[in-house]
Every structure is written in structure tokens, then in C-alpha cells.
Amino acid sequence: MSRRKMLFIYNPRAGKAQIRSNLLDMIDVFTRAGYEVTAYPTQARGDGIKAVVEKTPGFYDMVACSGGDGTLDEVVTGMMQCEEKLPVGYVPA
């Protein structure tokens, strides 16, 4: 049985950079839910858009993100540019 694939985009500087201390727990939750998770930390403005547009077509079943409203905005903007629309999840930082 193949596992569903998730791209998890996160901003390591969001929320007073506390995501780093919770990252493994979040990935563990997704893994237990049946996902093979690829974690992608953003480094600069626009990285979320670029990651979604370049990495998701035909490969991932879902995109999740964690960060502030800018991270969520970038992921949704990237998804709107893709022909195939995937479910998007959000974990506030």
C-alpha cells in the first residue's frame, strides 16, 4: 500500500521561531495519519509560492504549511497557480 505524500512548508522564523521545537512532533502526527512527509523550510519571501508551483504537480497529495499569514498566503497563491488543486492544511505558528 503506498502512502500519501505531503509537502510540508514551514517558516522557521515565524511565531518567535518556536516551530523548530515542535517540528518533529508535527511531522510525527502527519506520518501516523498515513503521510510520507517532505519538510521544506522557507528561506526568503516567495519561497512558499515557488515550492508549491515547482514541487507539487503530479507528486504530492496534499500541501500543509506552518507559519504566519504570509506563509499561508504564499502556499494558497502557489496552489492557485497550479492546474491541479490539492488540499491545503495550515498549522498556525
Where are these regions (language model features)?
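Small-residue-rich beta-alpha loop regions that form the catalytic core of phosphotransfer
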Residues: 2-93
